[in-house]
């Protein structure tokens, strides 16, 4: 979950990237570690999580056990 102060700004229509940049001081954070990287202190990265999501989503198409 997002911290309430960040969630409120997103609910008001602001994009998450600029809001996170404002609070972290990291320019263009969305092109770097992303909010996920900040919230997990670098344990997870934005690109790593997206990679895993795509692999999991495509696994039924590449594994005979699903047929």
UniProtKB/Swiss-Prot annotation:
* Protein name (database record): Inosine/xanthosine triphosphatase
Q: How does it assemble?
A: Homodimer.
* Enzymatic class: hydrolase
- Kindly state which reaction or reactions the protein catalyses: XTP + H2O = XDP + phosphate + H(+); ITP + H2O = IDP + phosphate + H(+)
Per the record, the GO terms for biological process are:
nucleotide metabolic process; thiamine metabolic process
The annotation note on the cofactor reads:
Binds 1 divalent metal cation per subunit; can use either Mg(2+) or Mn(2+).
Family matches, as InterPro entries = ITPase-like_fam, NTPase/PRRC1, YjjX_NTPase
Q: What keywords would UniProt list here?
A: Hydrolase, Magnesium, Manganese, Metal-binding, Nucleotide metabolism, Nucleotide-binding
Species of origin:
Enterobacter cloacae
Q: What EC number is given for this enzyme?
A: 3.6.1.73
Q: What does this protein do?
A: Phosphatase that hydrolyzes non-canonical purine nucleotides such as XTP and ITP to their respective diphosphate derivatives. Probably excludes non-canonical purines from DNA/RNA precursor pool, thus preventing their incorporation into DNA/RNA and avoiding chromosomal lesions.
Q: Name one Pfam family in it.
A: NTPase_I-T
Name the family: Belongs to the YjjX NTPase family.
Entry GO MF terms? ITPase activity; metal ion binding; nucleotide binding; ribonucleoside triphosphate phosphatase activity
- Keyword Manganese: yes or no? yes
Cofactor section: Mg(2+); Mn(2+)
